């Protein structure tokens, strides 16, 4: 058989033309040891901090420790499938999450993957989980209100757009309820919301999502969930992922509100990862950079300057205290980072004052500049009246023969405490809050028993809406109480007082 060179070269050329095998060039390493959600990997010399690496089976890991001869990787999936000697691939990507309108109405995990069973996200943009906070020049002072719909907060510890206001208190006294009410209050505003559940029970997160869906708030809300059963790495990443989603709106000149529920559990997750990575422990066994961990997260909430679009990201971080100890390490850290705190007290909660906000210990360091004039007019004396009432209440417990002025002050204080109570999931618009606080501050409630305040309030709203809509409309439109509105409100409340008197006899 004769071998012809032309034929052979022709066959080789055709085979080269049809050759379509892709060559996968990626830097790989080997797992040296694995345990407790941490893998030591040898051979990834060019790995970057916070880079995602891929283990067999598509499990992702986050590079946290860069050491001389190996890297420490926190695993974000099922650890049982990874063993010593496994190959690890670099992805070349720093941790990123999908952002934009596509994530609204969805429940995602700590890396932005959907977990609500509604199919894949059709997000076109992604954003790095870790971003540098805006500098001093890029910011503007807080000057626009961000309403929570809660009388006690909006009157005495007002929150402005771009502010960081801490919600702090023991377990099971309504911290999440305050945060969820703040989301519900944004229904007819231009604020998008992100709720980050960090280290919560799955049943609790499901309950929050069901509440948001029931009141139509999921349309403008994203829920980022890293539950207690998820790897510590996802619990650590979730707040940063949620923040990146909020920053997308902030940098587009829009407004966003983010709730971190709660940062105590994120700190515990970070402590766990740090100790397993053999980083030196500090106070309460937290790593030395735990303050930086929270400060770099909360500094990303800001009111941006007009040149950069005048957007804002408002943060409501939640911290859980142990037996009311606000002087513990994590609570003091976060108090010093934030622009004020709303302190919830078990004593008030069990006495039936809900939301259980301790007015004396709660402050808002920058919110006053953002408060509407109408609210300033009615809430100006409120804090002082309540503080004096608390003082007199303790004093009155010892003596019964009090002078008329003291009795009047006690009577006024009791009614003010009652009108600051509010049912869950019932945020109020500004005009309704102003109307009831106006009634309290001007003594229109003093003639009625303290236990009839809830009935008085409900009746007053419907009375004003039906018979004096101009008064409510003027407050909503002008955002202040003019002399005409003041006179109209007083006339309306006198008329309603006579009507209400007949109903309680």
Curated annotation (Swiss-Prot):
Bilayer topology term: Peripheral membrane protein
EC number(s) given by UniProt: 7.1.2.2
Catalytic reactions on record: ATP + H2O + 4 H(+)(in) = ADP + phosphate + 5 H(+)(out)
Pfam families cross-referenced by the UniProt entry: ATP-synt_ab, ATP-synt_ab_C, ATP-synt_ab_N
InterPro entries, A to Z: ATP_synth_asu-like_sf (IPR023366), ATP_synth_asu_C (IPR000793), ATP_synth_asu_C_sf (IPR038376), ATP_synth_F1_a_nt-bd_dom (IPR033732), ATP_synth_F1_asu (IPR005294), ATPase_a/bsu_AS (IPR020003), ATPase_F1/V1/A1_a/bsu_N (IPR004100), ATPase_F1/V1/A1_a/bsu_N_sf (IPR036121)
Subunit (UniProt): F-type ATPases have 2 components, CF(1) - the catalytic core - and CF(0) - the membrane proton channel. CF(1) has five subunits: alpha(3), beta(3), gamma(1), delta(1), epsilon(1). CF(0) has three main subunits: a(1), b(2) and c(9-12). The alpha and beta chains form an alternating ring which encloses part of the gamma chain. CF(1) is attached to CF(0) by a central stalk formed by the gamma and epsilon chains, while a peripheral stalk is formed by the delta and b chains.
Name of the protein in its database record: ATP synthase subunit alpha
Protein's organism: Desulfatibacillum aliphaticivorans
Lineage: Bacteria, Pseudomonadati, Thermodesulfobacteriota, Desulfobacteria, Desulfobacterales
């Amino acid at each position: 058989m004769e071998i012809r060179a032309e034929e052979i070269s022709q066959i080789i050329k055709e085979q080269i033309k049809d050759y379509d095998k892709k060559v996968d060039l990626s830097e790989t390493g080997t797992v040296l040891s694995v345990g407790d959600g941490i893998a030591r990997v040898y051979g990834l010399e060019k790995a970057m901090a916070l880079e995602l690496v891929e283990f067999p089976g598509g499990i992702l890991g986050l590079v946290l420790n860069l050491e001389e001869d190996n890297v420490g990787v926190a695993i974000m999936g099922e650890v049982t499938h990874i063993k010593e000697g496994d190959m690890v691939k670099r992805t070349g990507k720093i941790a990123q999450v999908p952002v934009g309108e596509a994530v609204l109405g969805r429940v995602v995990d700590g890396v932005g993957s959907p977990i609500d069973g509604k199919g894949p996200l059709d997000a076109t943009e992604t954003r790095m989980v870790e971003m540098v906070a805006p500098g001093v020049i890029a910011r503007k002072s807080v000057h626009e209100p961000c309403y929570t719909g809660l009388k006690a907060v909006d009157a005495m510890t007002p929150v402005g757009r771009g502010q960081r206001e801490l919600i702090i208190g023991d377990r099971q006294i309504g911290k999440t309820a305050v945060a969820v009410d703040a989301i519900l209050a944004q229904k007819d505003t231009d604020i998008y919301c992100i709720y980050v559940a960090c280290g919560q029970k799955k049943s609790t997160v499901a309950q929050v999502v069901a509440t948001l869906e029931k009141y139509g708030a999921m349309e403008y809300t994203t829920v980022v969930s890293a539950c207690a059963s998820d790897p510590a790495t996802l619990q650590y990443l979730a707040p940063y992922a949620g923040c990146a989603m909020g920053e997308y709106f902030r940098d587009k000149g829009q407004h966003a509100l983010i709730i971190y529920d709660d940062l105590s559990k994120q700190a515990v997750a970070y402590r766990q990862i740090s100790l397993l990575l053999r980083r030196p422990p500090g106070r309460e066994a937290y790593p030395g950079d735990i303050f930086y961990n929270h400060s770099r997260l909360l500094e990303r909430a800001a009111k941006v300057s007009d040149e950069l679009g005048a957007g804002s990201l408002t943060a409501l971080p939640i911290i859980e205290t142990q037996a009311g100890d606000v002087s513990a390490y994590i609570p003091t850290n976060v108090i010093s980072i934030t622009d004020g705190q709303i302190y919830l007290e078990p004593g008030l909660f069990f006495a039936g004052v809900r939301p259980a906000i301790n007015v004396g210990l709660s402050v808002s360091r920058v919110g006053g500049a953002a408060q509407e004039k109408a609210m300033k007019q009615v809430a100006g004396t409120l804090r002082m009246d309540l503080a004096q009432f608390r003082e007199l209440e303790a004093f009155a417990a010892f003596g019964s023969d009090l002078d008329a002025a003291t009795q009047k002050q006690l009577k006024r204080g009791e009614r003010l405490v009652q009108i600051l109570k509010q049912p869950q999931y019932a945020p109020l618009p500004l005009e309704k809050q102003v109307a009831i606080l106006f009634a309290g501050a001007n003594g229109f409630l003093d003639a009625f028993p303290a236990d009839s305040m809830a009935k008085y309030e409900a009746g007053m709203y419907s009375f004003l809406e039906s018979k004096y809509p101009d008064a409510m409309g003027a407050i909503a439109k002008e955002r202040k109480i003019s002399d005409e509105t003041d006179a109209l409100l007083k006339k309306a409340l006198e008329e309603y007082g006579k009507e209400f008197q007949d109903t309680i006899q």
